[in-house]
Amino acid sequence: MRDRLLAAEKVKAIDWRDDALYLLDQRVLPFEEVWHRYTTAAGVAEAIRTMVVRGAPAIGISAAYGAVLGARARIAEGGDWYPALEEDMQLLADSRPTAVNLFWALNRIRDRLMRVKNGDNPLAALEAEAVAIHLSDREANLTMAQLGADLIRKHQGNLQTVLTHCNTGALATGGFGTALGVIRAAHLEGMIERVYADETRPWLQGSRLTAWELANEGIPVTLNADSAAAHLMRTKGITWVIVGADRITANGDVANKIGTYQLAVAAMHHGVRFMVVAPSSTIDMEMASGDDIIIEERDGRELLEVGGQRVGADVEAFNPVFDVTPADLIDAIVTEKGIVERPDTARMAQLMSRKHLH
């Protein structure tokens, strides 16, 4: 299956070459394919903040490479460069506060720096660590894809009609995808009849990115308004809702793109299974529950302006980027370490004590 999954991969969003980070600008897809070249930590932080790159795993990978770029510049300046590099990493950390992969990746860079011995090349060590983070995410995606497809087969052997939210494919990760990776694997095994993709307002990641990725691979996809999701579950035979995650807490609560929580509520009401797919780097065992998660809010103009025109002078906007889905609404969390069905604190702790499967 691994070879079939790799052969099906057609899209990537991150490229590290010639001492620079190249990012596919996801703000202009699918209308244009524009790559930007970054050579500074500040530039990468701005790319994350402005959503040139998005998706929790992709953000973490980009931040790791951003730290390498920062180290190169600071070492070239001479002197005691570590405090200046720490400032660069803090700038990267501040770019998106909810995606725990960002902090996980930067902490791995810090840990690697602490292990550099006298006479070692610190820049080479940090670059190797960033590349390892990138490659391990790709391998995790392949493992999760197979585990998720196996879970679908275990519960329901017939053709599946799946609903997904936001974008969780190759564009959001180091390769292949999380939730979309599971859908790809299930399609390769002949289990997917159709995928419904929420448009995912206000950035339209579902319509611009997910529908584009699926259509490019010949997977039957139908785009729907976010507000049609419950109606779809009632009338179109949805069998699974499959989503990604930006942070998973110690008790199994999940922070993901705004709109995920209402999908889980509707799925519970309609008897539709709800699967979350994310690498273990998304799990924050230091955070007890979703009540502790800081929810990022973006500029209200994303909602208040249509075609460049403001909808109302005296209208305010509430524009959270994420919401929190309680663990008791989730049927399964799929990671590269394994699957947790009906997640709770004890089951999450057991999962995180395992070694990686890949």
UniProtKB/Swiss-Prot annotation:
GO process annotations (BP): L-methionine salvage from methylthioadenosine
Gene: mtnA
Family indicated by similarity: Belongs to the eIF-2B alpha/beta/delta subunits family. MtnA subfamily.
Known pathway: Amino-acid biosynthesis; L-methionine biosynthesis via salvage pathway; L-methionine from S-methyl-5-thio-alpha-D-ribose 1-phosphate: step 1/6
GO-annotated molecular function: S-methyl-5-thioribose-1-phosphate isomerase activity
Signal peptide: none
Residue positions binding substrate: R54, G55, A56, R96, Q205, N256, K257
Active site (record annotation): D246 (proton donor)
EC number from the UniProt entry: 5.3.1.23
Recorded catalytic activity of this chain's protein: 5-(methylsulfanyl)-alpha-D-ribose 1-phosphate = 5-(methylsulfanyl)-D-ribulose 1-phosphate
Protein name listed in UniProt: Methylthioribose-1-phosphate isomerase
UniProt enzyme class: isomerase
